Amino acid sequence: MEFPFDVDALFPERITVLDQHLRPPARRPGTTTPARVDLQQQIMTIIDELGKASAKAQHLPAPITSASRMQSNRHVMYILKDTSARPAGKGAIVGFLKVGYKKLFVLDDREAHNEVEPLCILDFYIHESLQRHGHGRELFQHMLQKERVEPHQLAIDRPSQKLLKFLNKHYNLETTVPQVNNFVIFEGFFAHQHPPARKLPPKRAEGDIKPYSSSDREFLKVAVEPPWPLNRAPRRATPPAHPPPRSSSLGNSPERGPLRPFVPEQELLRSLRLCPPHPTARLLLATDPGGSPAQRRRTR
């Protein structure tokens, strides 16, 4: 695939790795360096054209690879250039491979759901005129070494029949594990996968959470505290030297002393008459201007 600018100068290496920042690779010493904005624009043009060519080859309604998608996702793109062909001294692009990590729910051979985050093949394209020349295997092998993964550990997003034949021919990937999504995984995918931790659904909070562990909960199940007021700790008071006698009545408090005997009303009034008045009461009667001795006798 040719472009109106110098691809060989833009991509010094045979295989260039681009991330979401789309930064131009380091320039060779002694080469003319255009403005950085122009270099990034050229990279975006290459990515857009490669995405359109890949969508056309796979009969997709719209490209799944573009510069805007690369900038908004944490994907990695491997671009292979043709070092032998230099039309008009500008170089050419052979193809590309786009990968990225994704969280997936996949089924194993026992049809159990597993939450994994494998490296996924998201898009793969080699120019039609350069296929069956070993370029695809070279690009794929470079990606495996760079990402440090094995072919059976990959998940492929909507692979074409050409890609499935390619993987079967070069990496002996044939037996697939049926899935309910658009990703394809092969036998041996779970060989190096750690078993996922079983997560229980969160429970609705009921009241305050008590700060004790599960072992403390088991202990509390054995030693159940009695209800109030039986759970109140008794007060340790110093017993008196001569404790008062307790009443045998069930309605009286055990701490209350014996009641005084009942006094008849007539005897109570007689004792009040014989009781001498208080000095303060005498003073009030003496200072009362309207009170006569006769009236005081009648009121008494």
UniProtKB/Swiss-Prot annotation:
Principal subcellular localization: cytoplasm
Keywords for this protein: Acetylation, Acyltransferase, Cell junction, Cell projection, Coated pit, Cytoplasm, Cytoskeleton, Membrane, Methylation, Phosphoprotein, Transferase
EC numbers, comma separated: 2.3.1.108
Region Disordered, annotated ranges: 229-263, 280-300
Residue numbers carrying Phosphoserine: 249, 253, 292
Domain N-acetyltransferase: 1-190
GO biological process: alpha-tubulin acetylation; microtubule cytoskeleton organization; neuron development; regulation of microtubule cytoskeleton organization
Subcellular location: Cytoplasm; Membrane, Clathrin-coated pit; Cell junction, Focal adhesion; Cell projection, Axon
Residues bound to acetyl-CoA: 124-137, 160-169
Modified residues (N6-acetyllysine): 56, 146, 210, 221
Signal peptide: none
Asymmetric dimethylarginine: residues bearing it: 282
Keyword Iron-sulfur among UniProt keywords: no
Taxonomic superkingdom: Eukaryota
Omega-N-methylarginine modified-residue sites: 300
CDD domains for this protein: NAT_SF
GO (cellular component) term, any one: axon
Binding partners and assembly: Component of the BBSome complex. Interacts with AP2 alpha-adaptins, including AP2A2, but not with AP1 gamma-adaptin (AP1G1/AP1G2); this interaction is required for efficient alpha-tubulin acetylation, hence clathrin-coated pits are sites of microtubule acetylation.
Family classification: Belongs to the acetyltransferase ATAT1 family.
HAMAP family per UniProt: mec17
Protein name per Swiss-Prot or TrEMBL: Alpha-tubulin N-acetyltransferase 1
